[in-house]
Amino acid sequence: MDKTLKFTESHEWVRDNGDGTVTIGISEHAQEMLGDVVFVELPEIDAEIDAGDSFSLVESVKAASDIYAPVTGVVIEVNEDLQNSPELINEEPYDGGWIVKVKMSDPDELKDLKDAEEYLASIEED
């Protein structure tokens, strides 16, 4: 796992791209709990998302799960590959399975997220 990633309580990850944008996906732990992903509902480009609000939906053979925005901002890119290959979320949760890229409204929101070590400790308690 990339130690520069930040995580939410609801198992989303955030990669700071260093230019005021972030890439967002779901953690390996989350995809393991979901099982085989069969569909991903992507938001529209230019959609405004608010930290804590649902912006996407991932459906698996077991369940449908809302994906929550870790930060507030505007969607600048969506992972179109997930339309035809939703299994990328299972196969490459931190790489090919990313969901969106967002231009942040307030980069300070990243400070509220867990680092990789804190996140791993929290899921071991589950």
UniProtKB/Swiss-Prot annotation:
One GO cellular component, as annotated: cytosol
Function as written in the Swiss-Prot or TrEMBL entry: The glycine cleavage system catalyzes the degradation of glycine. The H protein shuttles the methylamine group of glycine from the P protein to the T protein.
Pfam families: GCV_H
Residues recorded with modification N6-lipoyllysine: 62
Family stated for the protein in its record: Belongs to the GcvH family.
Name used for this protein in its record: Glycine cleavage system H protein
InterPro entries, alphabetized: 2-oxoA_DH_lipoyl-BS, Biotin_lipoyl, GCV_H, GCV_H/Fam206, GCV_H_sub, Single_hybrid_motif
TM segment ranges: none
Cofactor: (R)-lipoate
Domain of life: Bacteria
